[in-house]
């Protein structure tokens, strides 16, 4: 039985109207899901300085550069003016600024960055150490994040590194928060540094 041209035309117009409505209201086929949250933990200290290098030259551990962008979940656009606040454990598994951690600089391995037009941020640090959770367990290497933006909901989360044998069985780890560790060749005699990229997607205050 041939298709009814009236019904075919009606279906086409219905689809066209839906497409126009979606475009007008910012609805896109491609999704940009918000970054999953993760506990803040007890070691956060507010007021960290704005700086790229959060590990002094004398800080023990493998050198690491972490870069990424802060994006909006609405349309995946970069968010200038976001503040990325990070902190993590030393190579020995201690958090500076906490009792018993040692060191004379409470802001070691802590810092903030403000994103520019591309939403980009960068930190130069060391690969975080692990620390014990009981006699037989270690927390995998991780970096804590607190990301804020005036028009978006604050996000508290953690970044984890692929290949860490202690990821398995850690109840806090989420697959989406695990990123690969790269080891790019050092140029011009510069010291070798590991590299990781972690983009953060924030939910808008109003949807």
Say what each PLM segment does:
Residues 1-20:
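N-terminal secretory signal peptides and thylakoid transit peptides that target proteins
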Residues 22-26:
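Hydrophobic membrane-targeting signal helices
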Residues 27-184, 191-207:
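Beta-strand-dominated extracellular/periplasmic modules and repeats
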